[in-house]
């Protein structure tokens, strides 16, 4: 969802990443690992649910969908990539820009769904 000032994004995460988000006070995403050059929140909850349920649960025993808002003016500098079907849109943020991305999050990151 997008208003003129903020864009709502979703991020499917496993339990380890969720714990790091919690430790940040629900205000930022943790740095990417060296083998993860892109941070890619997704553009809709349906796609985030699919990843959390179908990928995170088998990989780590549980999956969570997080929802957060980011300043539209900032988010618009990144490309939206379609990686499959109609719902499979991701915002591709280079890992080295994640700190700036985090500083443009409005409010807190919230968990909207949990899968086990």
Question: Where in this protein do the model-derived segments appear?
Answer:
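Conserved NAD+-utilizing ADP-ribose enzyme module
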Residues: 1-39, 46-116
């Amino acid at each position: 969802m997008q208003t003129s000032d903020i864009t709502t994004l979703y991020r499917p995460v496993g339990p380890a990443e969720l714990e790091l988000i919690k430790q940040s006070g629900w205000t930022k995403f943790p740095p990417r690992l060296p083998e993860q050059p892109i941070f890619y929140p997704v553009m809709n909850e349906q796609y985030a649910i699919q990843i959390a349920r179908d990928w995170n649960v088998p990989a780590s025993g549980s999956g969570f969908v997080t929802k957060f808002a980011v300043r539209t003016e900032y988010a618009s500098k990144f490309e939206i990539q379609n990686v499959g079907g109609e719902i499979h849109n991701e915002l591709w943020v280079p890992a080295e820009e994640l700190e700036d991305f985090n500083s443009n999050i409005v409010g807190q990151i919230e968990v909207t769904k949990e899968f086990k």
